[in-house]
Amino acid sequence: MCYTIPALVEDVNKGIATISYFGERKQAFCEFVHLNPGDYVYAQGGYVVEKILPAQAQKTLKAWKDVFFELRKIDAVSAALDSSDVSSDRLLQKILERARKGITLSKEEALYILGLKDEHNQLLVRRTANYLRQQYHNNSCCVHGILEISNICVRNCAYCGISSSSCVKRYRMSLDEIMAAAGEAINKFGFKSLVLQSGEECGYSIDELANIVASLKNKFPVLIFISFGEIGVKGLRQMYDAGSRGLLLRFETSNPALYEKLHLGSKLDSRIDHLKAAYEMGYLIVTGGLIGLPGASNDDLVNDIILTSSLHAEMFSFGPFLPHPDTLLANFPAPSEQDVLGVLSLARLMCAEKAKILITTAYETLSSSARENGLMSGGNSIMVNVTPLKYRSLYNIYPHRAHENQTVAQQVRQALSMLKSFGRGPTDLGS
């Protein structure tokens, strides 16, 4: 969003630009923009999305320069470990020391961490996760906008409030409405990355969805993620050719039997094959599972993290199960906040270097302090809902969603204030 800074193009070679943020070099694909050394750009997800005038870039960089390094100092102090960050639990201390050295945790070690009950030890795990986040990713925090274009869905998932059996009022935004909402997010609030989300077989044909993506790419400088469920390999290719470069598709559980029980008529293998095909096609992958899903064990949760990593996820998306009154799982409890933080921090410990970990809206719905606690437990990504208010409450996947009645402006102000207070800075998602 507006939490972005321009980069200087230092070199362009075979469609890949070397770009510099205050002297720190990264690389980004430049397939959408023709570049020369000396140009200034905005990049997201490892893609250059916009070339900007030097005067505009230099003005922004001047405003950011001192702030950029001050934020890093704030974050480094808050993420540092000290002499109090030790445990009398010798096995835990050994596991955390191994994690700090970059040694991959075994499944048994991961299960031990998830089974911790002592509050001090739980806090120590979270602080270690935050330390590793800072060591590998510095203070970068990515912010995406999410635009929910339709709540129509043919799936009948046992936990979802917009499943085909739900009595929720259905909507499908028109192309003009989508363009207007995206235009406000991009032009007024400076978003550089948008997730387009809907139910599966959401009232648009694949051709119509591809036209939406192409229309947005032709008009706006933005990285587009799609989240339309399983649309098939042909559909993925059509969306990619239209300009989408990211896919948000969660598998929810790595347990095949539990998956089939909760997703009637569907198989986990189909989901995984879809994600693998998207990665091979060039998509940035965002995936993960539900925490506290009825019937899931700690063993399943560890397998969820392992599977997410094996799918080459650019971003891990793990959120709590939240019961919806109109679903088969209405009477099951949500997990505790500690359960959620335990999984987020374990994901950081297990995948410290590559994981970008999202603080989901579901977690924000579970806890008003989700962003703060999640970002201090290894998380480094948030989302802002840019869906028009008249539709937002109808995307009722679980009750009383966070930010359901907030304007985009209100959400942006809150997000910026919170990120700056934690010393988090803007980032390009690519490596």
Residue ranges and their predicted role:
Residues 124-166, 170-193, 197:
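N-terminal pre-triad scaffold of radical SAM enzymes
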Residues 4-5, 9, 14-27, 35-36, ...:
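Auxiliary Fe-S-binding modules of radical SAM enzymes
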Residues 146-147, 194-206, 257-259, 320-332, ...:
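Glycine-rich, proline-tolerant flexible connector loops at the mouths of alpha/beta enzymes
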Residues 102, 129, 157, 249, ...:
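Conserved, mostly hydrophobic/aromatic
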